Amino acid sequence: MAKILVTKYENQADATVCEVAYESQADLCWYETPYEQQAQGDAKWLFVDYEGQASFKIFKVKYEGQADIKAFQVKYPEQARWRNAAHKFVGKMG
C-alpha cells in the first residue's frame, strides 16, 4: 500500500517529488484514493498525517532537476502507473 506522508524537510523524506504539468513528462502517474484498501502498489496514494502510518515519505520540490520522481496526478485509478518501468523507486513505495 502506498501510504504517503509529505514531509516538512527534505532530509526526512525517502524521495523528492516534483509535480509536472503533463503526463508525458512524468516518471509516475499517481491517483489519490480516499480509502486505505484502495491504496495499492506505487501509483495509488493515500495521504497520511503521521510518520508511523506512512509506507513512503516524500518532499515536494519546485523544479524537475531537484526531483527523484517526476509525478503527474491522474483523474482515474486505471491511469495510475509507472511510465518509466526502470525507475529506481519502482516497487518501493507501497
Model-identified regions with their sequence ranges:
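Repetitive, compositionally biased segments used for assembly/scaffolding
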Residues: 1-94
